Amino acid sequence: MGFNIGDKLVYPNHGVGVVETIGESLYDGRAHPCYQVRLLANNSRVVVPVGNSDRVGLRPLTRRQDVTGVFRVLEDGAFQSNGDWKGRFKQNLDKMRSGRLSDIADVLKNLNWVQKQKTLSFREKKMYERARYLIVSEIAQVSGTTEAEVELDVEKALDRSVARRRSLGPNAR
């Protein structure tokens, strides 16, 4: 997938960025075409070789019509998780690394359910906050609304998920 200057994209686990320049950088003794991306979260800049963009997981923003599917994941009430926190953490980390917004929504929903049952570990709490930020910031960019508005929509979806989950009973998966 190729990007142009000014394109917004997603850098997995870091969030939305903008391609500021496309130039060449020297490494391994050769010049390689590279994207210089400014991450909107903290204004930091990363340089990604064009040839590595797929491997790194750079992707365009989620399409506007796919946002509905993300909210469906958030509110569906289904819960899949490894029983112990280490297994759950690894499972969720793999989903976070995929960079797909639907996978990140699944992580957020699952961790939201777990935190309703017990206190999250420090690492899971950080992952929960990161997943929430990544979802809110990307959907705000795609939909042209504020992060505060998206935050409210995400909270409502998570509340519906918990209500659905509770209606299924304690042994439902």
Regions found by a protein language model. Name each.
Residues 51, 56-173:
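Charge/polar-rich, low-complexity and marginally structured segments
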Residues 25-36:
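Short, solvent-exposed secondary-structure boundary/capping segments
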Residues 17-19:
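Conserved hydrophobic positions within beta-strands
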Residues 6-7:
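Loop/turn positions that initiate beta-strands
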Residues 36-51:
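A short macromolecule-binding patch
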